[in-house]
């Protein structure tokens, strides 16, 4: 998770899973990872731990690319598509390698991994280490007005998507990574160019099914 909204949606999903498995079960079996890269979660870690919904809550000191000065040379414009592609391949490999020491848990040991905003460093790490995962849209219907994958890879998008989805030579976010199994979105019809891996899982039913006890847990984590 990178934002409070991500944590909120994770609560909704985990509460639904708990209810379906055993309504009397109090302790969850999932690990919640809070990335510190783009948000200061303050004391959210301890507040979430107090709910008992997750087996453990970890903080991830995820590093942006500018933290590693050795990556800067791969961002230089060579003036040619093939030259830039060669640099991007090297960038993808090196970024994943450099990020590895900051990942706080062995993700290979998990059955299911859900990642919000896989455009962040964790997406590079997972794909270059051949770890399969499920992506989740960064914000509610966020792809309706801005498709980051297509914008960031404008110019020869289909070629870049192929190199990412099938060859894993570069990384394209939002469902186009080779090891991204699918990507959850709230409303596929709102997306102009949906990726074949998008699956529609509306958020409203997750909220509508909340019990009084569920709402108290949410208040405990986010308000009280």
Regions found by a protein language model. Give the residues of each.
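Active-site and donor-binding regions of nucleotide-sugar-utilizing enzymes
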Residues: 1-175
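A nucleotide-sugar donor-handling region in carbohydrate enzymes
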Residues: 137, 144-224
């Amino acid at each position: 998770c990178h934002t409070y909204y991500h944590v909120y949606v994770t609560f909704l999903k985990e509460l639904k899973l708990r209810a379906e498995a055993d309504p009397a079960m109090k302790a969850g079996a999932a690990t919640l990872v809070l990335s510190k890269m783009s948000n200061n979660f303050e004391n959210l870690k301890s507040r979430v731990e107090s709910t008992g919904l997750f087996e453990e809550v970890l903080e991830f000191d995820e590093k942006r690319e500018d933290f590693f000065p050795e990556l800067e040379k791969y961002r230089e414009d060579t003036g040619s598509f093939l030259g830039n592609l060669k640099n991007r391949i090297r960038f993808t490999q090196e970024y994943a390698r450099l990020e590895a020491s900051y990942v706080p848990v062995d993700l290979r040991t998990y059955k299911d991994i859900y990642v919000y905003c896989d455009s962040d460093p964790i997406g590079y790490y997972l794909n270059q280490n051949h770890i399969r995962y499920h992506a989740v849209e960064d914000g509610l219907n966020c792809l309706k007005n801005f498709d980051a994958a297509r914008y960031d890879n404008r110019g020869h998008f289909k070629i870049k998507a192929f190199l990412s989805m099938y060859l894993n030579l570069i990384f394209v976010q939002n469902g186009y990574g080779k090891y991204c199994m699918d990507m959850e979105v709230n409303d596929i019809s709102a997306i102009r160019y949906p990726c074949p891996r998008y699956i529609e899982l509306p958020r409203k039913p997750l909220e509508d099914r909340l019990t009084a006890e569920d709402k108290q847990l949410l208040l405990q984590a986010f308000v009280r």
